Amino acid sequence: TNWWEKLTTNITYQGKFNQEILENLLTSANLVKDRDFFPQKKQTTYDIDDNKDKDVIPDMLLKFPERNYIVDAKVSLTHWTKYINEKDEKQKKQYLKDHLASVRNHLFGPKGLVKKNYNKLYGIKSLQSIIVFFPASNLYSITLDADKTLQTEALKANFILSSPTDLLNMIKIFEQIKSEKKQIENISK
């Protein structure tokens, strides 16, 4: 099987592909693996539905002095790739509709991110919101343009939807906060 077929049909491969894009993006922002970010690091959270602790493996943990940030990179590409390659307009609309349903299921479905309780991880001062990474800017913008309520519903559920550019901008802000904090500490010494 070639890589394109895997990318368009195999959800596990898609997840690894998305995660690789995310890791490359973080590295390009001068973050260092296993110091500034930690891929697939097992954490413990509280499962309110089962009333017990459970282990989870977030795609990425970004570590900054004041806060840590959880990033999910598992947006499905199956229907998206069909959508961008389809010539027939009627079929193209259906693939986009299927893609939107897939994104919503990933966020809000019975086994979706909303059930993972990433914002309740033990021992990690993480933001209440989870950053949901879309690995391509056009994937992000077309998804939000086609589903006008997705962004609002995501924010209500403590998800920050992010394109690669958005994530780089957030990292820049986090880095500036870290730098300013260091300057203040140096001045007060």
Features from the language model and the residues they span:
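Amphipathic, heptad-repeat alpha-helical coiled-coil/stalk segments that mediate oligomerization
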Residues: 2-189
